[in-house]
């Protein structure tokens, strides 16, 4: 059973694996994403530390509404769920979609990207212990923005949801 953390007062710190001041193997990265544990990972003094707060169910719903939950493509959502996991199979599957289906899928994927950005903005408290306005994420380069948001959401999801043993 999985349940959401009901407290939004819990904060935690992360570093982003693509930060040049952070050195980790793929196995260490996988473990870090799953546990948040930085043991055996080399983190230089120049690394950027992000302080995040957990999000309640209401916070997550509000972020999804801001991202367009009521106008997202339901056909796109259905196709996204049905898409194969294997890269080659997915490419072949995607190629067989009609133009209308491809457009619906693209719209849904854009909605997911907006949702992740809204989750990240709602959870960001500080960078390097300095309080920041969450709009600072909009100032990142596109490549950095994608990586930072993706990793923030991985850690945020882990910290905002508790397994039965985590209660």
Where are these regions (language model features)?
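Short, intrinsically disordered N-terminal pre-domain segments
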Residues: 1-17
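Intrinsic disorder/low-complexity segments
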Residues: 19-21
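Short, surface-exposed, charged amphipathic helix/loop patches that serve as local interaction elements
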Residues: 23-167
